[in-house]
UniProtKB/Swiss-Prot annotation:
Residues carrying the site annotation Cleavage: Y437, S438, G895, G896
Annotated Peptidase S30 domain residues: 292-437
Organism of derivation: Lettuce mosaic virus (strain E) (LMV)
Gene3D superfamilies: Helper component proteinase
EC top class, as a word: hydrolase
UniProt free text on domains: The N-terminus of helper component proteinase is involved in interaction with stylets. The central part is involved in interaction with virions and the C-terminus is involved in cell-to cell movement of the virus.
Motif, Involved in virions binding and aphid transmission: chain positions: 747-749
Protein name (database record): P3N-PIPO polyprotein
Active site, renumbered: H345, D354, S388, C781, H854
Organism placement in taxonomy: Viruses, Riboviria, Orthornavirae, Pisuviricota, Stelpaviricetes
Molecular function GO labels: cysteine-type endopeptidase activity; serine-type peptidase activity
Family note: Belongs to the potyviridae P3N-PIPO polyprotein family.
Any GO BP annotation: transport of virus in host, cell to cell
EC assignment: 3.4.21.-, 3.4.22.45
Record carries keyword Protease: yes
Length: 1152
């Protein structure tokens, strides 16, 4: 059967659990094994440890380690009695024994260790009996054992008279008792012999041991270490060895002589005392009686001294023998007079025993403490930091207190919730875990030091050393404290309240009054504390940082104080914060920075607007939040499934479906409805995806769209009014300025899809159209916009709205109307039905290639890559109807053709038609390849004044194409065309005049450059100035688009290569530029050469004619001299003799 006493394995414990129904775990088994290792008893039920010696209860091994202090058990006499002696000795029979005296003369003795029946006769044959010996007898004589009883032979008895038998029986009883006593004595001697033998090593160890006092006051032997004992043994052996070599023979000394002569007392003669010839003093010596005190008088003295100490709170010191002393003072705690002893932890020492009070001095301390609140009962909650050293009555303390071994309890601190006695010995670990209850001043400095070291900066790059004097540091710290706070005591609450109630100005005045004196004091007495001086100067600067310019504040408030619009509202708030000066909080300063940021944004946006709508910074992100449609959220207009209720609007919607929608027959398939055609292109619907494939691969393939070419962000994507962008009438871009392209739109049946931003909203078609599928006829997809407006029309006005839309709007719009006309029609309808201004539009896609708007219906779109119009409501769409709107999309067809779109007049700049473009060699369908022929046209017109005049009149912006080549620009400058353009267009078109001025300036800079690379860099740098002029011209023409494209290409090329050029790299385009320059210069290079030849011929002919005319007028006799003079003048003018007219030429001219 399993028991817990023989539980050596875990399975034993589990077997015990099964038999007895207990629930002991492995933790119990581990604690049981730990108890066996340290010699403790483990209580399985209470889960505690019990000491077998002191019977103390402990809950953990840590408590045993910290608090268990009992000694090992002392030896007992029973420990030295063998197991054989522990057995009960046989009790001899004290009845009558008949002893037969043999004839042998040897003395017979009795053996009482043999258990023999009473009637048997015991016989011994030996000389003596040795009691209490378990070894062989020392005598050599054999011991004759008692013969075994013979059952067959009858016992021999001797009949005697009755009285002698009784007397002999009494004598034998006495002898038996005496023998038993001797046996007991022998056993006791044997036990003590074993005890002496076992204690011999222990007693020998005590010869070298010292006596020490334990914590409980008991005196114990403290043995020396093994190395000390070995050292003493060697020393004793050495002394014994020397004694053996020189043995000492004792002798009696009966006479002492000095050098063999007589003693000094015999040889010295007695001298007579000298006579003092002075008058003896008449002063009588006072002999004080020696004070002798008994125990009663000493007790009274201690009581009186204790009363004085406690009442006056004086310090005292009780001194004992040698260096024993106890220091303390009288104090009060909660109105009770107590004795406070000086402990070690108050001096900064953490020791196991905080204070040692000798036994002889403890009674005196107790008597002094008894003169105060000795009989007051104390609880642990009444003791707190600052109570260190308080002497309490051990019998009058209640609560969580540690071990109490003496009549007095000296407070030390708290650990694990218990108050510890300073006289108790604790472990080294507890000394560091204990919260010492030292006094307040010590706590202050301990807290200061701890916090100072804890908050030491972690980014110090050097090793700190003690360079300043500690006393000087304390002095400077006191100066700083008094300068900033000016307290009578740092613990004074009234000073703190008075300081708190000071206003900001009063506090600044109070600190300013003292800070100058403190700075001077530190400069003179502590000049090494330069960091403190910098801090004080900074404090002084902050306190005096006041803004007294109230005049400017009032003037600003007067000028724009009533303006609530931006940026004036930000200026007003910033003005209110700045006037506060140093009274402004950090939050207000942060708000001031935000106001400055808003002002900076305003001026930045204003600057960008001044730049005439540059596309570089154009951003038109779509809102991430879906538009709230109140009509679709009103519970009164929703059915039980949350769908929109058309009501009477459903009946009147037939006017749209009957005339402008085509019914789809699904039985014939959707193939003929897939392509949505318009006069200038087509778009592929996603209606075919209504046939859903359950195969994942096929379905994923049906979700892939067919993208078109992206034209990028151009001026076609934006709309402006007054030079500012009208964002609802622009294409949507991402946060980087790239146009957002449309994705595939999946189809649905019997729905009206609303929402141009965010997630689409699906509205069920009217009940009259239920079960049928409708698609708008070609050219009438804008009817979906009117159908979306019908959702917000009240039911009683639905008839008027549909009639007006059909008879007025649709009748005038017809097929493929322009966006301007559609917006105008929406504005007319919204004027009579204002609720439709907030109507949500279907998604509208922009196709810049075909100049078309696509209004997406419920059948979606397979074709992707279109731009998205941002307009989401009717109010935003109506902006396209404004005449002041500058937008190409304003004239796009809603499913129309670009050639039919009306164009605005170009003002002073004429617009080229199709025929004119063909005459110039330009193809309007591909503008990318039209730069070269127009540039060739410009090159031809450089030295042809009439062609140049015609070119400047029709397409003046072709001059900007000259920046492609430095040679072309220089030729254009030298021909005077730029000067002519500046003067002709100065009054009519200042933009063209400014363009010519910029080209002239670039030509001058190019002429100074020595290499083609530098010349191209100059032209690319000047492209930005030309782009600013081309941003918003008065009209549109082909030359403008070509010039704009050329300038943007050069700017993009410069920006792309800027980083490479800055770091020293060169691009491979330099060689390409040389080839292009040769190619372009070839056109006008031959022309220049021909002009040079013609100029040479004309010059020579003119000189010859002039020379002949002069020769004919001169004297014939001096013709030879005149000829030489002409040659000399030609050499002087041309610096070349071959250019001077020759004599033959003169002669021929004379002959002619």
């Amino acid at each position: 059967m399993a028991t817990l006493d023989n539980c050596t394995q875990v399975h034993h414990m589990f077997a015990y659990n099964r038999e007895h129904g207990t629930n002991y775990t492995r933790n119990h088994f581990r604690r049981y094994l730990a108890a066996q290792r340290i010699g403790f008893y483990y209580d399985w039920d209470d889960d505690v440890y019990e000491c077998p010696t002191c019977e103390a209860i402990y809950h953990s091994l840590d408590e045993i380690k910290n608090w268990h202090e009992c000694d090992p058990p002392a030896f007992d006499l029973n420990d030295f009695i063998t197991d054989a002696r522990l057995k009960s000795a046989p009790v001899p029979d004290l009845g009558p024994v008949i002893v037969e005296t043999p004839k042998v003369e040897e003395k017979q003795e009795l053996n009482f260790f043999a258990a023999t029946p009473a009637p048997e006769v015991l016989q011994w044959k030996c000389r003596g009996l040795q009691f209490g010996s378990f070894t062989e007898l020392e005598t050599s004589e054999p011991v004759v054992s008692a013969p075994k009883p013979n059952c067959e032979e009858p016992a021999r008895t001797i009949a005697k008279p009755e009285e002698p038998v009784e007397q002999e029986t009494c004598g034998d009883g006495k002898r038996l008792l005496q023998a038993q006593m001797e046996v007991d004595k022998a056993e006791q001697d044997l036990a003590f012999a074993y005890l002496s033998a076992s204690l011999k090593p222990r007693l020998e160890g005590r010869t070298t041991a010292t006596i020490a006092r334990r914590r409980d006051g008991c005196l114990v032997y403290k043995t020396k270490p093994s190395w000390s004992q070995r050292k003493g043994t060697k020393k004793i052996l050495k002394v014994d060895t020397l004694a053996c070599k020189n043995p000492y023979i004792p002798a009696v000394v009966d006479k002492i002589s000095i050098a063999g002569g007589s003693s000094a007392s015999v040889m010295h003669e007695q001298q007579k005392p000298k006579i003092l010839h002075t008058t003896p003093s008449r002063k009588v010596a006072t002999h004080y009686k020696r004070t002798v005190m008994n125990q009663q008088t000493l007790t009274a003295l201690i009581n009186q001294v204790g009363t004085i100490i406690l009442n006056a709170e004086k310090e005292f010191e009780v001194v004992g023998c040698r260096k024993q002393k106890v220091t303390g003072k009288g104090t009060r705690h909660n109105g009770v007079r107590l004795v406070k002893l000086k402990t070690a932890h108050e001096e900064g020492h953490r020791r196991k025993v905080d204070i040692r009070i000798p036994n002889g001095l403890r009674s005196i301390v107790t008597r002094i403490s008894a003169r105060g609140g000795w009989h007051k009962t104390w609880t642990d909650s009444e003791l707190s930091p600052g109570s260190s050293g308080y002497v309490l009555n051990s019998s009058k303390i209640i609560g969580e207190f540690g071990l109490r071994r003496h009549s007095i309890f000296v407070v030390r601190g708290r650990v694990y919730g218990k108050i510890i006695d300073s006289q108790s010995k604790v472990t080294h670990t507890l000394t560091h875990r204990m919260v010492q209850y030292s006094d307040v001043a010590r706590n202050f400095w301990n807290g200061y030091s701890t916090c100072f070291m804890h908050n030491t900066p972690k980014d110090i790059l050097h090793t700190c050393t003690s360079d300043f004097d500690v006393k000087d540091c304390g002095t400077v710290a006191a100066l700083l404290t008094q300068t900033l706070f000016q307290f009578g005591k740092i613990t004074c609450g009234k000073c703190a309240i008075e300081y708190k109630n000071l206003t900001r100005d009063e506090l600044a005045t109070r600190v300013n009054k003292e800070i100058d004196g403190t700075i001077i004091s530190i400069q003179t007495q502590h000049p090494r504390f330069v960091h403190v001086l910098n801090f004080l100067r900074l404090i002084k600067q902050v306190l005096n940082a006041k803004n007294g310019n109230f005049g400017a504040f009032q003037e600003t408030e007067r000028i724009i104080g009533d303006r609530m619009d931006a940026p004036f509202s930000h200026v007003n708030k910033l003005n209110a914060i700045v006037i506060k000066g140093n009274q402004a909080t950090s939050d207000e300063m942060a708000q001031a920075s935000n106001h400055v940021l808003e002002i900076a944004r305003y001026f930045k946006n204003r600057t960008e607007n001044i730049q005439k709508g540059s596309l570089k910074s154009f951003r038109n992100k779509i809102s991430g939040k879906a538009h709230l449609n109140p009509s679709l959220m009103c519970d009164n207009q929703l059915d039980k499934n949350g769908g929109f209720e058309w009501g009477q609007r459903s009946y009147h919607a037939k006017r749209f479906f009957d005339g402008y929608f085509e019914t789809i027959d699904p039985s014939d398939g959707y193939s003929k409805y897939t392509i949505r055609r318009n006069p200038n292109g087509h778009r592929k619907l996603a209606i075919g995806n209504l046939i859903v494939s359950t195969n994942f691969e096929s379905h994923r393939r049906s979700m892939v769209g067919e993208p078109i070419e992206d034209p990028g962000l151009t001026n076609q994507c934006v709309s402006k009014e007054g030079g500012a962008f009208i964002y609802p009438c622009c294409c949507v871009t991402d946060e980087y300025g790239k146009p957002t392209l449309s994705e595939i739109k999946m189809p649905t049946k019997h729905h009206l899809v609303l929402g141009n931003a965010g997630d689409p909203k699906y509205v069920d078609l009217p009940k009259e159209a239920e079960g049928k599928m409708f698609v708008a006829k070609d050219g009438y997809c804008y009817i979906n916009i009117f159908l979306a407006m019908l959702v917000d029309v009240p039911e009683d006005q639905a008839k008027d709205f549909t009639k007006m839309a059909r008879e007025i709007a649709v009748k005038q719009l017809g097929e493929w109307p322009s966006m301007m006309d559609v917006a105008t029609a929406c504005n007319i309808l919204a004027t009579f039905h204002p609720d439709t201004r907030r109507s949500e539009l279907p998604r509208i896609l922009v196709d810049h290639a075909t100049k078309t708007f696509h209004v997406i219906d419920s059948y979606g779109s397979i074709t992707t890559g279109y731009h998205i119009l941002k307009a989401n409501t009717v109010t935003q769409l109506v902006k396209f109807a404004h005449e002041s709107l500058e937008s190409e999309m304003q004239h796009y067809r809603v499913g129309g053709e670009p050639d039919k779109a009306p164009r605005k007049p170009a003002g002073n700049v004429p617009t080229l038609g199709i025929s004119d473009l063909k005459n110039l060699g330009v193809e309007s369908e591909n503008e990318e390849h039209s730069i070269r022929p127009n540039l060739q046209r410009l090159i031809k017109a450089i030295y042809r004044p009439r062609m140049m005049r015609s070119l400047l009149t029709e397409e003046p912006y072709l001059l900007i194409l000259s920046i492609v080549s430095p040679g072309v620009l220089m030729a254009l400058y030298n021909s005077g065309s730029l000067e002519r353009t500046m003067h002709e267009f100065l009054q009519t078109d200042q933009r063209l005049s400014a363009t010519a001025q910029i080209l002239k300036h670039l030509a001058k800079k190019v002429s100074l450059a020595k290499t083609l690379t530098i010349q191209n860099a100059i032209l690319e740098g000047g492209a930005g100035s030309l782009n600013e002029i081309l941003d918003a011209p008065a009209g549109r023409s082909l030359s403008y688009r070509l010039a704009k494209q050329t300038v943007e290409v050069m700017m993009a090329r410069s920006d792309m290569d800027k980083e490479l050029v800055d770091v020293g790299f060169s691009v491979l385009r330099d060689q390409k530029n040389e080839l292009i320059e040769k190619k372009l210069s070839h056109g006008f290079g031959g022309l220049v050469a021909r002009i040079a030849i013609v100029w040479k011929i004309i010059s020579n002919a003119s000189l010859a004619a002039m020379a002949g005319h002069l020769y004919s007028r001169s004297n014939p006799n001096r013709c030879r001299r005149f000829e030489r003079q002409i040659q000399y003048l030609g050499w002087v003018c041309f610096q070349k003799r071959d250019l001077a007219p020759k004599g033959n030429l003169l002669r021929r001219s004379k002959e002619s």
